[in-house]
Every structure is written in structure tokens, then in C-alpha cells.
Amino acid sequence: MKALIIEDETAAALNLKAILKQAAPDIRVVDTLESVEESIGWLRANPQPDLLFMDIHLADGDSFRIFDAVEIAAPVIFTTAYDQYALEAFKVNSIDYLLKPLNACLLYT
């Protein structure tokens, strides 16, 4: 399974990669992106991954803007420190909403 990580905090992205390697070794992270604009460009230029892990607050805006620019068919797991966006997240392809800091136990459930 191919996954894309959209996360502007380097430490959080590295933590998520480590958790995925431990909890779901069959998931291969194809890229890690840090901004809305970079993500839009990547999604337009590449085949969609099987799964997206997406932070909501990115340096250049909120990641919901990506859905306005690109049709995303893959399921999305939002990873954020803010719980107030849960309803908005489930209006798009969200299958889960994980609050930071992440740990491996969250991915097992």
C-alpha cells in the first residue's frame, strides 16, 4: 500500500513514518510534502496513493484547500493537534482523525 504524508513539521512527519514502519510495515511512504501548494502540484503530477496522512494546519494554509484544487479519491487520515476540525474533515474523504502527538497504539485501532 502506498501512502502520502502531508505534514509541515519535520519531527511529526518522521514520527509518523516510524510509527507506520512499526505498526504497518506493508505501507510504503511515497513522499512527504510540507505545503498546500506543493501537495496540489504533487497530486496533479503523480498517481494518487492508496492512503493519505494529512495535517490540517500547514505553513501556507489549511489542507482543506487541497480538496478544492484536486479531486482526491483515496481515503485520508487527518493528523492534527486541533480537535475543532473533525466535522469538516469527515465532509471529505476522511476515514479517521488522529490528534497529535501520535503513537503506534492509535494506528492499531
Give residue ranges: language-model regions.
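Non-catalytic signal-transmission and effector/linker regions of two-component phosphorelay proteins
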Residues: M1-K2
